[in-house]
Amino acid sequence: MKLEQRVKERKEEQAEEKKEEVTELSPEEAKIALKKKIHQRLLEEFDLKEWNIHTQDESQKQALYKRVRGIIENLIAEEASLPLNRDERSEVVTELVDEVLGLGPLEKFLRDETISEIMVNGPQKIYIEKAGKIYLTDARFTSTEQLMTVIDRILSPIGRRVDESSPLVDARLPDGSRVNVIIPPLSLIGPVITIRKFVAKRLDMDDLVRLGSLTREMVEFLRVCVILRKNILVSGGTGSGKTTLLNMLSSFIPEDERIVTIEDSAELRLRQEHVISLESKPPNIEGKGAIPIRRLVINALRMRPDRIVVGECRGGEALDMLQAMNTGHDGSLTTIHANSPKDAISRLTTMVLMAGTELPERAIREQIASAINIIVQTARLKDGSRKVVKISEVIPLEAGEMKIQDLFYFEQLGYDENKKVVGRFRKCGVLPTFFDEIKIMGLELSEDIFKDEVKV
């Protein structure tokens, strides 16, 4: 027998042996084997760094997606020996396209509009938030290396990086979704990603009333407060709906006013025409060039604003915000992390002290009492629902003291058979001190909305 014939027969035997080995794999093992094989061939034949749908516009994205999907389908068709049916092959194609073009196992969650947050706790655990509840998914990364590759895909288009010398970073996806990344040595479980997804459809007041976040009477009162240029502080915990409520309040600002919004990460979407949106700037790779919120607040005062809307007060900018409210820039809006209206006042006092001011605490509280008119307290309840749990008026008293008078509050009564919160919005039977001002301005707001209870 000729040598060429023996080589040919041996190759055929090896192919048959390989086929037999593959057919013994479980469907999941076969999928993993196929993905690894195709991914390796893609690495050998193409420059995958050029393929990133998150750096493309929509038309380029669709063209690239179609091209790459076709390439992968052709490569898979050549692997006829693997025991996968049509649906399984299609699933493998989609997963490979997501890995090659996008953010791997995160892509399907980014496409799902019902998901509000994505949380990656190392390569083996991916959580999602739906309707205010957190769920562990069965998705995972194949390795820490794949997870770090996805992180690089997020950061490299915007000129950011994360490594041991700079192990945490904030970023934003092209669709506006906020991203936080933290890696070892700060994270002890491996790389961690938190993505707060950008919501394409903004909830309006009708949506919030329908969802039971507040009553129509509460909305009407807040609308009047905005028109009267009352300074409003939205207080609440993480994920309690502060930004959503701030968007709603901002929608009540008259069209003919010049509005300056200031945020760490742009989330506010005002519909008015005359809006200037400012965003703080983090330091560059060398740790230089940062422009914090406080500097933007100071600069906004030179921009002839009718209203200043600060996405969130976290530090020394609270002093400049209060001074703006007390010096003619009334009608301003902002949010703060706090668990109650009283706690919000304490937090504001602490933040002003963080600004390095030499003002005594009594003087700071006097500024707060004269600057803040209304506090709206939000909360995320145990069933995942978000509600306005209090609307309170801040009433200045003498010697730096103030009274926090509740006007509306949510009374929780228990849970139903589906473990949903049962409760009612109640009114405290007290008129706001500026009710006469409402009548003088000719605004329609009945005294009755402060008297009778409304069940939901």
Model-predicted regions and their roles:
Residues 1-135:
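N-terminal anchoring/assembly modules that precede and organize ATP-driven motor systems
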Residues 51-53, 78-85, 101-112, 154-171, ...:
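Active-site phosphate-binding and catalytic loops of NTP-dependent enzymes
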Residues 112, 120, 125-228:
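P-loop NTP-binding catalytic core
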Residues 180-182, 374-384, 397:
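AAA+ ATPase "lid" subdomain C-terminal helix
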Residues 219-235, 244, 248-371, 377-379:
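Switch/coupling sub-region of P-loop NTPases
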Residues 241:
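Conserved glycine(s) of the Walker
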Residues 384-456:
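NTP-binding/hydrolysis catalytic cores, primarily Walker-type P-loop NTPases
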